[in-house]
């Protein structure tokens, strides 16, 4: 299973006075089971890119493949794609709307045509996966903490049993404890379910801690793609894009400049 983008381009407002080219010839391939960090400053194109990956936006030019099939081919089942490639938007708790947590998480599976019993079984499993026990089932989602709301929203996507989970800034607005809890749950999903994870973030510290591979976007283009240690070697270029490498990267560089022999593969503490 893989996602493959070939010469992907996207233009907002094409043919109008407000035309804006958001993606330029993006080429990438994401393999089954990878944990990919997608990073870039505001306006870099990362959010536009992920909306292509599950078919919410159609490219202005280029091709996109899922499991070897061109999703732009005639008759392709976009509904099936969106159930396999789950997308959690930034501030997803704003989309919570049901009277209680369990009912809210059941919404996606029911929309897939599952019975009430099947949907509830999926929802309970998803809530367990994000660390919410049965005591939360009948609680109003609006009475939960910010981190708990975020986990309910993620469970709503997991209940649809996607093969790929894309998260757009999943820790935005959370306190440090809430941020760590969310990221640890995502990491656990990757390790225990071998789920493909695409984590969109502007935090180098977060992606260095969890991701196996980093893709850096800037002005709609893919500028770096590789292991964290390879990408962080370009920390001077990253700074020109409004990004900063993890603090440990600067420390290692300073130590080496002062003649101290230290492993420069270190990306986290």
Summary of predicted features, one role per range:
Residues 54:
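Helix-to-loop junction immediately C-terminal to a conserved catalytic motif
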Residues 63-80:
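ABC ATPase NBD Q-loop/coupling interface
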């Amino acid at each position: 299973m893989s996602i493959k983008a070939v010469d992907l381009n996207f233009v907002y407002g094409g043919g109008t006075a407000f035309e804006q080219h958001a993606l330029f010839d993006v080429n990438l391939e994401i393999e089954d089971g990878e944990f990919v960090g997608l990073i870039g400053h505001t306006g870099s194109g990362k959010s536009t890119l992920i909306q292509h990956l599950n078919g919410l936006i159609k490219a202005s030019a280029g091709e996109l493949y899922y499991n070897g099939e061109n999703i732009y081919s005639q008759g392709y089942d976009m509904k099936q794609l969106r159930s396999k490639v789950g997308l959690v938007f930034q501030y997803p708790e704003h989309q919570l709307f049901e009277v209680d947590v369990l009912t809210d998480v059941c919404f996606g599976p029911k929309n897939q045509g599952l019975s009430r019993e099947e949907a509830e079984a999926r929802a309970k499993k998803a809530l367990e996966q994000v660390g919410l026990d049965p005591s939360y089932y009948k609680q109003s989602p609006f009475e939960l903490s910010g981190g708990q709301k975020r986990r309910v929203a993620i469970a709503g996507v997991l209940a649809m049993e996607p093969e790929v989970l894309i998260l757009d800034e999943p820790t935005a607005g959370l306190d440090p404890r809430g941020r760590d809890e969310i990221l640890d749950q995502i990491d656990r999903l990757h390790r225990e379910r071998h789920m493909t994870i695409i984590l969109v973030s502007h935090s180098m510290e977060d992606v260095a801690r969890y991701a196996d591979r980093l893709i850096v976007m800037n002005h709609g283009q893919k500028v770096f793609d590789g292991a964290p240690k390879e990408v962080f070697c370009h920390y001077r270029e990253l700074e020109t894009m409004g990004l900063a490498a993890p603090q440990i990267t600067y420390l290692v560089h300073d130590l080496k400049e002062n003649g101290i022999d230290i492993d420069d593969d270190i990306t986290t503490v």
